[in-house]
A protein has these predicted regions:
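Short helix-capping and hinge/turn segments at secondary-structure transitions, especially at repeat
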Residues: 175, 194, 225-228
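Gly/lys/ser-thr-rich phosphate-binding loops in alpha/beta enzymes
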Residues: 22, 87, 159-168, 176
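Short, well-ordered, mixed-charge alpha-helical segments that flank or form enzyme active sites
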Residues: 107-108, 130-135, 141-146, 172-173, ...
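Active-site glycine-rich loop that binds ribose-phosphate moieties when present
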Residues: 141-171
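A short hydrophobic beta-strand segment most commonly corresponding to one strand
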Residues: 120-121, 179-203
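Conserved metal-binding segment of the jelly-roll/cupin
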Residues: 99, 164-182, 191
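Transition-metal
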Residues: 1-141, 201-233
Length: 233
């Protein structure tokens, strides 16, 4: 068999976001030198965390480099040079993720240097008994009321919270306010984008004592204000 026809293994890129835990190391034997380990980007050509080929003819190269050198791997009509249209990751939420929203493709293209927007799908690999997630609002919201609640820290009373169980599937369309809750372990398939507008972060600080930045104005540009969305697919 020619090397061109052989599959190859990938090493993931890791992310040490403050809400992560150890399950990706303990349950999946991920050998990444970071603590906590919040996410592993298993199949990625995104510049913020490309996967690295492990072994074989392409050992040590990024997946992006391989696909640029061999565009035939992407078929006859690749969308862009060396890039996959999706990104696949594992997520370990030891703590709640920030309340956030992602733009659609049109908004991201105009306001985020031509980036894709971000719709995503979560498959729940495991979840603690009391695990929940935020998915949209309890009822229709007015933009000014939402803005005020974000600025004064009362937004949680408007958020629709949903219990999470193993094998649940959730589709998070661009524009949907959402947050993965503590105790959930998920696999995510998403558009190849890292554009996130953080709306509320529970007044947390990072390991340096700094509050993480919020993106309220852009979030208000893209958020879907309709309430009572149906989360499960």
């Amino acid at each position: 068999m020619s090397w061109k026809n052989k599959p190859f293994l990938l090493k993931p890129a890791g992310k040490d976001y403050l809400w992560g835990g150890r399950r990706l190391k303990d349950d999946f034997s991920k050998e990444l030198d970071m603590e906590p380990l919040a996410e592993t980007w298993e199949c990625s050509t995104h510049p913020d965390g490309p996967s690295i080929v492990s072994g074989g003819a392409f050992d040590g190269k990024t997946l992006t480099e391989v696909l640029k050198a061999h565009p035939e791997y992407l078929g006859t009509h690749p969308r862009s040079e060396g890039e996959l249209p999706i990104l696949i990751k594992l997520i370990d939420a030891k703590q709640d993720l920030s309340v956030q929203v992602h733009p659609d493709d049109a908004y991201a293209k105009e306001h985020e240097n031509g980036s894709l927007g971000k719709s995503e799908l979560w498959y729940v690999l495991d979840a603690k008994k009391d695990a929940k997630l935020v998915y949209g609002f309890y009822h229709d919201m007015e933009k000014q009321v939402l803005k005020e609640s974000l600025l004064n820290g009362t937004v949680e009373k408007y958020l629709q919270k949903v219990s999470v169980q193993k094998d649940d599937v959730f589709y998070i369309e661009a524009g949907t306010v959402h947050a993965l809750g503590a105790g959930a372990l998920v696999a995510e398939i998403q558009e190849n984008s890292n554009v996130t507008y953080r709306m509320f972060d529970y007044n947390r600080v990072d390991k340096h004592g700094n509050a993480r930045p919020l993106h309220v104005d852009r979030a208000l540009d893209v958020v879907d204000l309709k309430g009572s969305a149906s989360p499960r697919q």
